[in-house]
């Protein structure tokens, strides 16, 4: 320990430095805890996610009601002002086009003092240094001056007005308004929790990741779709063809080709050479229109080619990993190639739209030399994409399989269980894992695989694929993934995927208490869970187990909204308690600007704090308390740690 305190003394070489830091940390501990925002299953739907981050899921509007007496500010419309705070660039352009020049200037004059007052109100729960870090360098000094003078002596009004007038003269007012709005947006959410699945069927997971990379404080709990992209970057051929197949299925190849710069030309040529469009592989467009009909056919053929490659590679993996106990999923090996049928649970089914041209009936899982070369070329393209690497690096830096934070347990999928509530076990390398140990194993293997991207069929890389579709995967949560059956078998009984018992057991208070204990959390904590859409229109509720379990699948994917009856949930945890937010579908920014698309549906109080929660009561507060103790020890034994 003496070395630790000697190093600490180098950072604080004078006793007065220690006193200053201790007072600063003690003061921070007495501030209200910052607002945490939980969001899950983003599924590439950038505009809807961006809207919620801009608005703080309605928190900005709610705080504005506390900040002003709007009955006295008759000249300003609350909703109109909110839109300026949410979409400042777009709102300014909209007003400029729809107002006269004089009316537009008058409106800008009215907005700036209001924005300054809002910023001051929103920043009151933070230290000055924290607020200063969020201010734009361009206007930092000016904003600090305006913040200092907004509520002071009326005699200084001319000082305030002179600053604004000069900004008008220099044509900088619009830029200032934009910066003020953006700063307010940042301050409304102190910490963001992304509970998995940034990727999936939506078109812009890359834009979401770019947005998240600019966020000051956040963490990510990986989802099953995230892990397949991480697996592709880690060297898994299976994960790679899977993400291409899904992109083709949902008309999102442009993400791979145009925005990640991954060349698919050889795959396109291969797909055209061996496949032709078939009904089972018609892309799902989620209401979007294709500008070129030929593109539909191409996506159809790419989807077929990658599906067959996936089933071949899957059969190979299952052969080399008997411990995965997935031999019943080697369906490409179980096909009767004489009549193109398959027996599933002792029932023979005729295959539909099954192109076996590239399959050796004597060794169905064997890749042709052309396919091997194709996969190698694709892997090089994936692993040398700088933009993809930037995003995957970020997922590894900020992500984990689960997180314990402020007495809450966050994870995406499930904790695999038996129907009696015992943890399901997964035996690997002679050792059995379950519960928390299982998730720790999965995370260590994911990180090991990414550290060795040149290895394509080692255990760590294969476990990433297991996380996508294995029965004991905490990210999948079902007994089998029936992709093969959904493509090739008409009988929908074969398409069924049985959920792990966890998804029924999580309704029970005692089960959730046991889960919290497994992760060393108190019984009054909460579990925040994503992954499964809540079918509220069928009576399902997102608040379970007497408030211990909170299911917050964001419902952003348009394809799920018709089944759920709404657009999902997010969660706010501030110094007053926990609120569950339900959402309506996001339509467009244009409708937001016109005031016709406010997607916050309802807010439900999950838990109200008895006393206002302070920083000292949080995970960060525990760290600060330890720092204070260390500083106090150094202060009292200052001379003992001289070199």
Swiss-Prot record:
One of its GO terms (biological process) is gluconeogenesis. Pfam families: FBPase_2 (PF06874). Its cofactor is Mn(2+). The lineage of its organism: Bacteria, Bacillati, Bacillota, Bacilli, Lactobacillales. Disulfide bonds: none annotated. This is Fructose-1,6-bisphosphatase class 3. It comes from the Bacteria. It comes from Streptococcus agalactiae serotype V (strain ATCC BAA-611 / 2603 V/R). Keywords: Carbohydrate metabolism, Hydrolase, Manganese. The gene is fbp. GO terms for molecular function: fructose 1,6-bisphosphate 1-phosphatase activity.
